[in-house]
A protein has these predicted regions:
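Helix-to-loop junction immediately C-terminal to a conserved catalytic motif
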Residues: 66
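Conserved signature/switch motifs of ABC ATPase nucleotide-binding domains
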Residues: 143-146, 164
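Short coil-to-helix segment of the ABC ATPase nucleotide-binding domain corresponding to the Q-loop/switch region
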Residues: 104-111
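Hydrophobic anchor residue at the start of the ABC signature
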Residues: 158
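A short, flexible loop at the N-terminus of ABC-type nucleotide-binding domains that lies
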Residues: 8-15, 24-37
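Conserved ABC transporter NBD signature motif
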Residues: 74-86
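Conserved ABC ATPase "signature" region
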Residues: 115, 122-140, 192
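Catalytic Walker B motif of ABC-type/P-loop ATPase nucleotide-binding domains
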Residues: 169-172
Length: 275
């Protein structure tokens, strides 16, 4: 079930290629390393989960792949092109609910990136409605963000990201602030949408359960300054009741050094909240 991250020479069909990337930030005259050395590939239409301890650089690495942070070392390439800035081939969804424009309607929020990329108002609106229907929000097109629940706001953000028809969808703990029932519902919807649109997904989470529900492979990062501890294939495990699923959950807990009593409390809380 487990595998060491493949070397770059071993993967010839990668959409995303992370090659010995180092990331960090300056505090005065001192450079603090957040990600020491990360190398992995992502194949087209693959669902990759980044998981690791808090503060290990998961979100920093995601933003670097999105083109928002320049690596201090190594290279990031998408579709064979080195990533130096944001581009329409990548779209990102954050955790925060305030990522929508409060003065624009749901339809206008989704259409906005299409308009700034040169689409006519009519074409942008038609495309936006198509993706609102995909996320089951077409009936809320005329509402404003303050009239939406947290889950609905995240679905708008997903629709807006998908409207660009990116090759790579980047998601930074988008369901982390939602209640368990809404989170599980959106996880199921996301799996369906990604399969239908054939989008490549890179998803950051701190939840082992979420990683197992959403991922094809899970990339485990160590403590900061982090590196890739292991790349784990989580396909074909079956549901939570299977032995394979339980063994994989235990393996990921071991890699992340999660205490058994804390993990059990989280599982019990999710079971109660989820009904």
């Amino acid at each position: 079930m487990t595998a060491v991250a493949p070397t770059l020479a071993e993967t010839g069909n990668a959409l995303v290629r992370i090659d010995h990337v180092q990331l960090g930030y300056w505090v005065g005259e001192r450079f603090h390393v957040a990600v020491r050395d990360a190398s992995f590939d992502i194949a087209p239409r693959e669902k990759i989960i980044l998981i690791g301890p808090s503060g290990c650089g998961k979100s920093t690495l995601l933003k670097a792949i999105g083109g928002y942070i320049a690596p201090a070392g190594g290279t990031i390439a998408v579709a064979g092109r080195r990533t130096l800035e944001p581009g329409p081939d990548r779209a990102i969804v954050f955790q925060e609910f305030d990522q929508l424009f409060p003065w624009r309607t749901v339809l206008e929020n989704v259409a906005y990136p299409l308009r700034i990329n040169g689409r006519s108002r009519r074409d942008a609106a038609v495309a936006a409605m198509r993706f609102l229907a995909l996320t089951r929000l077409d009936q809320a097109a005329d509402r404003y963000p303050h009239q939406l629940s947290g889950g609905m706001k995240q679905r708008v953000a997903i629709a807006r990201a998908l409207a660009l028809e990116p090759a790579l969808l980047l998601m930074d703990e988008p369901f982390g602030a939602l209640d368990a029932i809404t989170r599980q519902r959106l996880q199921a919807e996301l799996n369906g949408i990604v399969a239908e649109r054939e989008v490549t997904l890179l998803f950051v989470t701190h939840s082992i359960e979420e990683a197992l529900v959403l991922g094809d492979r899970v990339i485990v990062l160590g403590d900061a300054p982090s590196h890739v501890l292991e790349v784990v294939d989580v396909r074909d495990l079956g549901g939570p009741e299977t032995v394979a699923y339980s063994q994989m959950r235990g393996r990921l807990r071991d890699l992340l050094r999660v205490e058994d009593d804390v993990a059990e409390m989280e599982d019990q809380a999710e079971h109660v909240d989820g009904g």
